Curated annotation (Swiss-Prot):
It comes from the Bacteria. Gene3D superfamilies: Ribonuclease H-like superfamily/Ribonuclease H. Its main location: cytoplasm. The gene is ruvC. Its cofactor is Mg(2+). GO terms for biological process: DNA recombination; DNA repair. CDD domains: RuvC. This is Crossover junction endodeoxyribonuclease RuvC. The keyword NAD does not apply.
Length: 175
């Protein structure tokens, strides 16, 4: 009988970008097992100018990345709404959310909000309550302090799930 290789846990950070609150969630994925590591949010003061808020988000994420040392990152894609200015500002926060891990040499994946919901809940139009219920099941030790931190954990779970599928497809293809 051939010995099975030891599967090393991979640490993943999920990031839910926002100008008021950027959520982050760190998990470890080992095979199909998920382990909660930590979560929270970066909240720059509302009265700061835009550039200073973006800097605060970057500095906050850089501290989280240094403290938790994830190997991979996942960021939620921005949805376009009717307010073009708000969408552009959210896009700037998202740029910071992608830049911070990249500056640490961490690969960054992107997932659409509906893809996150479908992966975690099974329905692409799930609400925040349904996500919270599934987080309790998938990560029973997690107690996210905000909806943004919960969303970030869901993004990390989505990445863990999709990276496993990608690894399996590569194995089947002999790569």
């Amino acid at each position: 009988m051939k010995a099975q290789p030891i599967r090393a846990a991979i640490r993943i950070i999920g990031i839910d970008p926002g100008l008021r609150r950027t959520g982050w969630g760190v998990i470890e994925s080992e095979g199909n097992r998920l382990i909660y590591v930590g979560c929270g949010s970066v909240e720059p003061p509302d009265d700061l100018p835009l550039a200073s808020r973006l800097l605060a988000i970057h500095e906050g994420l850089a501290k989280v990345l240094a403290d938790f040392q994830p190997l991979e990152a996942a960021v939620e894609q921005t949805f376009v709404n009717k307010d073009g200015v708000a969408t552009l500002k959210l896009g700037q926060a998202r740029g910071i959310a992608m830049l911070a891990p990249a500056m640490f040499g961490i690969t960054v994946a992107e997932y659409a909000p509906n893809q996150v919901k479908k992966t975690v809940v099974g329905a692409g139009h799930a609400d925040k309550g349904q996500i919270a219920v599934m987080l309790k099941i998938l990560l029973p030790k997690a107690e996210p302090p905000s909806a943004d931190a919960a969303d970030a954990l869901a993004i990390a779970i989505t990445h863990a799930h999709h990276r496993q599928g990608q690894a399996l497809r590569m194995k089947v293809a002999g790569l």
